[in-house]
Amino acid sequence: FMGKRDTYKYELTKGNKVVYVGITNNPYCREKEHHQDKDFDKMKIVGNISTLDGASKWESDRIKTYMNNHNGNTPLYNQNEHGK
């Protein structure tokens, strides 16, 4: 049993820069929460709705890819490569 697909993968962008990578089961509420403490233009849903496991793996991989392309720096609002 794979677990249910209820998790969205997303990026927050400011201009053409990715400032945060995350996952959520409620994009609408999550976007409102992010607006309280982050400066970004839009929330972009990435790919298809996933299982939590699949989304978590994507999140770590996506942040690592970002870091590889940005001298080891995480996106502005990600504290570490696990998206926390």
Name these PLM-found stretches.
Residues 3-84:
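Structure-specific nucleic-acid interaction/processing domains
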